[in-house]
Design a protein with these regions (language model features):
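Beta-strand-enriched cores of mature, soluble protein domains
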Residues: 1-149
Length: 149
């Protein structure tokens, strides 16, 4: 199986909304207030209004459920839904929770984004499978997204 880079996506996240314990774990909602993305075939900004509905499971794994709207540099809107997992050693996850920068090789942060585009120029996004590797930042995250060929 081969892949090639699709884009690098950086999202801005203010302090999250902590719902607390729910039947399947601990729910935290992280609003997405903006960001940028850039790749060989598309670039633009992340519109405010999306979010990452995370669930911290009892085994320490964080389930990610990111849903955002991308606006390309020529005004096209693209919906992106990305699901994934983040986990690692307790001391590394504690450092991330404190807002510290942590080497992304020290923890697992993988996603599988899907896209919906109505503009023909970006319709190729509707027909691909992608994978991403994430990096937690003090005020958001960076996702390096590859398309599977």
């Amino acid at each position: 199986m081969t892949s090639r880079p699709l884009m690098t996506l950086q999202v801005e996240v203010p302090p999250p909304q902590k719902l607390g314990p729910v039947p399947h774990g601990t729910r935290v909602i992280a609003p997405i207030t903006g960001g940028v993305f850039e790749g060989r075939r598309l670039r633009g900004k992340v519109l405010p209004g999306g979010g990452d509905w995370t669930l911290l499971r009892s085994d320490g794994v964080l389930e990610l459920d990111l849903r955002i709207t991308l606006e390309t540099d020529n005004g096209a809107l693209i919906f992106m839904a990305s699901f994934g997992l983040r986990h690692g050693p307790p001391e590394v996850l504690a450092a991330i929770a404190r807002g510290e920068s942590v080497d992304p090789s020290k923890y697992y942060f993988r996603t599988f984004p899907r896209f919906e585009a109505s503009v023909e120029k970006y319709a190729f996004l509707n027909r691909m499978i992608c994978v991403g590797a994430g990096e937690a930042l003090p005020d958001g995250a960076i996702h390096r997204i590859d398309e599977i060929l």
